[in-house]
Amino acid sequence: MEKREKKNDSIFQHRLERHHDELRWLYMELYQNGDMFAELCSQMYEYYNCRSKKLKERDLKREKEPDWYHGKDMLGMMLYTDNFAGNMKGVKEKIPYLKECNINCLHLMPFLDTPKGRSDGGYAVADFRKVRPDLGTMKDLIELTEKCHEEDINVCMDFVMNHTSEDHEWARCARAGEGEYMSRYFFYDNEEIPEKYEKTVPQVFPTTAPGNFTYLPETGHYVMTTFYPYQWDLNYRNPRVFNEMIYNFLYLTNQGIDIVRIDAVPYIWKELGTTCRNLKQVHTIVRMMRMIAEIVCPGVLL
């Protein structure tokens, strides 16, 4: 047991050493916060340790075959769990059918917990660590990914980075006036800054959800809502937001996810006087995510 732990530690340390300097440089460029970077590295080690033996073996294999996803035999299927099979267990039962279709990449459309009637098709996430109850549980997801892996099927999911649901724990605390959580979003107590953003930021849904801000009368603040009023934009200028979203990302990959489609990523960095689309900081954040994945879960494709 001790030898195995030392081997695992050495694998992690080797990967960390390979990326540490660039990762730290990029992190400090955005955040200038050494304590938060140290916390990030510590948590990366914890999530690596929580990764199952089978997933670690899968990582090692894919490190040796980094172009595993380039094969001409790769064939994917994208589906909504409820429409296809009712729930996660139903999808698991239909794996023989997927094999008959020669499917080796299964893209599950958003399945995390969302508020009923305000879900935006699953893209208004209320809890990044909970499956929507009618679809199953995290245990069901793990059982599905394990069975898929046994049948050489990769599992893909969407990771919503730009925003959370207004029902997310952070948003509820922010609505209650807790400054720590208000700083994780874009809150303004008057129209001055929102109006400046509106001059340069295009509208995503000008007909169904006009504008990029929503006024909350109970707090007396405007909150940035690029998509729908119930989807609050996260403030990636706050290192706590970046760190916590990375922890959510690593938690999900530890459930057996092979491929992560980052949703709405062009929007995640906001800068007054710009369109707030595809800014250079977005690419810095995605690069850091890729390096973190290569350290903790290199078998996962972004």
Regions found by a protein language model. Give the residues of each.
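Receiver (REC) domain switch/active-site residues of two-component response regulators
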Residues: 258
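Acidic/aromatic-lined carbohydrate-recognition and catalytic surfaces
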Residues: 1-237, 242, 254, 265-302
